[in-house]
A protein has these predicted regions:
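A broadly tuned preference for mixed-charge, low-complexity surface segments
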Residues: 45, 99-107, 139, 228-237, ...
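Local cysteine-cluster metal-coordination motifs and their immediate loop/turn environment
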Residues: 1-10
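Flexible glycine/acidic-rich beta-alpha junction loops that bind and position SAM and/or redox cofactors
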Residues: 4, 118, 122-123, 153-160, ...
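Conserved non-cysteine loop/helix-boundary elements of the Radical SAM core domain that shape
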Residues: 10-211
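Conserved N-terminal phosphate-binding loop of PLP-dependent enzymes in the Aspartate aminotransferase
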Residues: 216
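Radical SAM enzyme core and accessory elements
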Residues: 3-4, 27, 243-314
Length: 314
């Protein structure tokens, strides 16, 4: 499902179940080709991040096959961080989390956005606050070194009091990263298309002020910040963590000193030449059907990535 605030490319696994295996087959081939290119270009992987969407909509077997192929294809010996978005708690179970641990994943994200059940219903989430609590107990109990939780200030039907309850619960669950987003009124989202009623800028400001005070009181510190277009109240998104739990991938994105090679439908590859302060991007086709059918686009993007880095070396 796609949440009411989201305008990202997404496909319902339930409605497109027949595409999953063909999609994974093409993704496996792209991983093979990308790993060969990275090795031949003499590049090294510092951080791995699998996002979406919600990768944990895959079955445990599908995830196991995907990560097995990934780990065999790429040299991850110098990779300091292995992160996967577990995302919605209704996609998380012990079997899937064990697969992630078995393959060396050391950072996951469980993203409730809110822990007020009426807010979750308003934004189209299928899970409850209780589901989040159970997913977090499972993740922390199984020993994941780092767990992030995403929250959004300014969601429909939310209030400063409800946001406070949500944040206090997140702090009690043992997450060492909490990312506080401000609602972005994105074109194409249901919130805009269907004229949802959202909290005022003043109310959102109260939510963020509370987050700032409560997180600092809990020994969290902000380590990255960014703004998006159309944000409620012109506020920002802030990543908070306890000391030593910083997410490297987030830092690399903000610094814009590292290239990011993206694989899969909807991916955006960023090529960075820090010496000459030059950045170029190439984009994958957006939808799974296009991704499966247009193998030449995958080849073009990998070729562009290789050429960019060859040119950097002169």
């Amino acid at each position: 499902t796609r949440c009411a605030y989201c305008s990202f490319v997404s496909q319902s696994v339930e409605r497109t179940l027949g595409l999953v295996e063909p999609y994974l087959e093409v993704l496996h081939r792209e991983i093979t080709d990308a790993a060969r290119m990275v090795q031949e270009a003499g590049l090294h992987i510092k951080s791995f991040y699998m996002g979406g969407g919600t990768p944990t909509t895959l079955s445990a077997d599908q995830m196991d096959r995907l990560l097995t192929h990934l780990n065999r294809s790429f040299d991850l010996s110098g990779c300091a961080e292995y992160c996967i978005e577990a995302g919605r708690p209704d996609t998380i179970d012990r079997e899937k989390l064990q697969v992630l641990l078995d393959h060396g994943v050391d950072r996951i994200s469980v993203n409730p956005q809110s822990l007020e059940d009426h807010v979750l219903t308003a934004i189209g989430r299928r899970h409850t606050a209780r589901d989040v609590e159970e997913a977090m107990a499972l993740a922390t109990g199984m020993g994941f070194p780092h767990v992030n939780m995403d929250l959004i200030a300014g969601l429909p039907e939310d209030t400063p009091e409800g946001f406070r309850r949500t944040l206090d619960k997140c702090l009690s669950y043992g997450a060492d990263n909490i990312t506080v987003h401000t609602l972005s009124l994105k074109k194409g989202s249901r919130i805009l298309l269907e004229n949802f009623t959202i909290p005022s800028a003043e109310a959102v400001g109260e939510m963020l002020d509370y987050a700032n005070a409560a997180l600092r009181q809990a020994d969290f510190r902000p380590y990255y910040l960014y703004r998006q277009k159309y944000m409620s109240g012109s506020f920002e998104n802030t990543g908070w963590c306890i000391s030593g739990a910083e997410g490297l991938y987030n830092i690399y994105i903000m610094e814009e000193l590292h290239s990011i090679l993206s694989l899969g439908a909807g991916g955006s590859t960023k090529m960075v030449d820090p010496v000459h302060q030059r950045i170029e991007r190439v984009f994958h086709t957006k939808y799974p059907t296009e991704y499966i059918q247009r193998s030449e686009k995958l080849e073009e993007n990998l070729s562009a990535f290789r050429q960019f880095h060859e040119n950097m070396r002169g």
